[in-house]
Amino acid sequence: MSESPYKSGTTHFGFRDVAAKDKQKLVGQVFTSVARNYDLMNDLMSMGVHRAWKRYYVATAQVKPGDRVLDLAGGTGDIAALLKERVGVEGSVVLGDINAGMLSVGRDRLTNRGLVLGLDYVQCNAEALPFPDNSFDLVTIAFGLRNVTDKDAGLREMYRVLKVGGQARVLEFSEVTADWFKPIYDFHSFKILPKLGKLFANDSDSYQYLAESIRKHPPQEELKAMMGQAGFERCHYKNLTGGIVSIHSGYKL
């Protein structure tokens, strides 16, 4: 297990080294800036494919009617909405996010869609979740783990709040596996994406950070090992779209 960033004193914020205690605030500023344009941001970052990734991510989760699910870094609520369809009226979904602006957007959007019952919204830090042990049948985090300062702590908390037999699933931008595609992907990420952010959201800096944060995120095998170190068993991952994203899964047994 790697040393906590809080003990070493520094961590990365994109390609910059910053004090570990400052990263949460810096990431918060990014997501406060992009909250109202979050879906646009995902469209630009994924070239529009993120919607299909998310549908597959939820469709392949072992979630059933009556389950209680925690969706961390739930953002604008698109994953929570898909999960609520699957748990039905007997089940419940808690949408957790550290950023109040993102949480507000998610609540408004789901309420406007008529999704009210069985949905709760909690502002929380993934590194110190305000839930008892063994609370959820499924814990998800989509495009959020790379922004957590202490990822090991976040994974341990996901494990703690899962019920025995429960599953954790991580959907995240990952390491591209096709060598021929890497230069194309890098060009899009570092040359095109910030310009699109400036053009459509008047915010190139946030999009530059988000591209850099993907490159600093642990690659597939490393994240799989981290999940095992956090206590998860039967850990595995599946690459989507040539490794642009991957889905990692682990169980509390």
UniProtKB/Swiss-Prot annotation:
Q: Which GO terms describe its molecular function?
A: 2-methoxy-6-polyprenyl-1,4-benzoquinol methyltransferase activity; demethylmenaquinone methyltransferase activity
The record's annotation in CDD domains points to:
AdoMet_MTases
Kindly tell me the pathway this chain contributes to: Quinol/quinone metabolism; menaquinone biosynthesis; menaquinol from 1,4-dihydroxy-2-naphthoate: step 2/2; Cofactor biosynthesis; ubiquinone biosynthesis
The coiled-coil regions, if any, are none
Q: Does the keyword S-adenosyl-L-methionine apply?
A: yes
Among the Pfam families in the record, one is: Ubie_methyltran
Residues engaged in binding S-adenosyl-L-methionine:
T76, D97, N125, A126
Could you tell me which InterPro entries the record lists for this protein?
SAM-dependent_MTases_sf, UbiE/COQ5_MeTrFase, UbiE/COQ5_MeTrFase_CS
Any Gene Ontology biological process: menaquinone biosynthetic process
> Which key words are in the record?
Menaquinone biosynthesis, Methyltransferase, S-adenosyl-L-methionine, Transferase, Ubiquinone biosynthesis
Catalysed reaction(s) here are: a 2-demethylmenaquinol + S-adenosyl-L-methionine = a menaquinol + S-adenosyl-L-homocysteine + H(+); a 2-methoxy-6-(all-trans-polyprenyl)benzene-1,4-diol + S-adenosyl-L-methionine = a 5-methoxy-2-methyl-3-(all-trans-polyprenyl)benzene-1,4-diol + S-adenosyl-L-homocysteine + H(+)
Q: Keyword Methyltransferase, does the record have it?
A: yes
Question: What domain of life?
Answer: Bacteria
| EC id | 2.1.1.163, 2.1.1.201
Position of the signal peptide: none
Top enzyme category: transferase
Q: Which family does it belong to?
A: Belongs to the class I-like SAM-binding methyltransferase superfamily. MenG/UbiE family.
Per the entry, what this protein does is:
Methyltransferase required for the conversion of demethylmenaquinol (DMKH2) to menaquinol (MKH2) and the conversion of 2-polyprenyl-6-methoxy-1,4-benzoquinol (DDMQH2) to 2-polyprenyl-3-methyl-6-methoxy-1,4-benzoquinol (DMQH2).
Q: What is this protein called?
A: Ubiquinone/menaquinone biosynthesis C-methyltransferase UbiE
**Organism the protein comes from:** Stenotrophomonas maltophilia (strain R551-3)
Q: Which gene encodes it?
A: ubiE
